[in-house]
Amino acid sequence: AKIQQTATFNQGFMTTELVAASILDMNWHDLTSVEGIDVNTFEKEQMAKIGLIEEIIPRYRTTYFNHIFNSGYSAGYYSYLWAEVLDKDAFDLFKEKGIFDPETAKAFRKNILEKGGSDDPMKLYKQFRGAEPNPEAMIKGRGL
């Protein structure tokens, strides 16, 4: 039991810093021009807008947030959280129907695995799950 409890230790902090980094990423990529912008001031203003307290800083500060500037993650850092939402919500269906329920497994295979990127992801997910992903599953999984 104690080992299982460690899985949700400090998740409030970790979730907050991940959300803050995701918002910062989106805000940088929402700009039409960066000319004349002071990086530290911009970051501080963005974190103040969401009410982030000084004790919780974003996972990565702008000056070393390589994910959002040097890779395919531009304006997509949030995808870590979104993937977790999908994971937890999909698994909840398996738990509801039975982990080894053949119909649930078949629906997952036919609507998610077989289709890949061939259609709108939300459409495919809804065909599998019967509804849009529910973030509550992730929140519960994090012990929040």
Spell out what each predicted region is.
Residues 1-144:
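Cation-handling catalytic/transport regions enriched in His/Asp/Glu
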